[in-house]
């Protein structure tokens, strides 16, 4: 065995870290620019390399707006919005012909959410909805439509407007991923 048997695993982890750093930089609006005299060197989150760390422009970090986000605890509304965004995005990426395991995973996820959701009142309501309307995950369309109807059930109980489920794909369509890397086809460590 080589001098560093963990090297391949750590290299994969470094690739993942770099990918996450790149996506976060893109998300918050930092451009990846080559180092200049105005840049300050900052340590990367993870590095296996002994070469100098990536340089970023500290002035660009200081000028980022906070986008009207409070610094207090997450509200029920924020949590709900984030959860629905995640679930609808998951449904949009769900395969048209899921495996038995994928169908089982969706149903388990819904059950786990109904037990572990941080808002107890919301979790109990979701549990009631699941009892009368179990998760449907036979295809991408079926899962997306089921989720839309469940979301509308929650919205009605909150006195909110309902969403026209025939427009669910237009609202929550596939992510824009290179080479369809976002599609649910199993697990991979290739980044």
Curated annotation (Swiss-Prot):
InterPro entries per the UniProt record, alphabetical? ALR/ERV (IPR039799), ERV/ALR_sulphydryl_oxid_sf (IPR036774), ERV/ALR_sulphydryl_oxidase (IPR017905)
Q: Where does FAD bind?
A: 76, 81, 84, 121, 125, 148, 151-152, 155, 160, 171
Recite the UniProt keywords alphabetically.
Disulfide bond, FAD, Flavoprotein, Mitochondrion, Oxidoreductase
Question: Where's it found, cell-wise?
Answer: Mitochondrion
What results from changing residue 182 to A?
Loss the capacity to oxidize thioredoxin
Query: What does UniProt say on post-translational modification here?
Result: Contains three disulfide bonds; one catalytic disulfide (Cys-119 to Cys-122), one structural disulfide (Cys-148 to Cys-165), and one shuttle disulfide (Cys-177 to Cys-182).
Disulphide bridges, residue numbers:
119-122, 148-165, 177-182
Pfam families recorded: Evr1_Alr
Q: How does this protein assemble?
A: Homodimer.
Which PANTHER family does this chain map to?
A: ALR/ERV (PTHR12645), FAD-LINKED SULFHYDRYL OXIDASE ALR (PTHR12645:SF0)
* Protein name per its UniProtKB record: FAD-linked sulfhydryl oxidase ERV1
The scientific name of the source species is Arabidopsis thaliana (Mouse-ear cress)
Q: State which gene encodes it.
A: ERV1
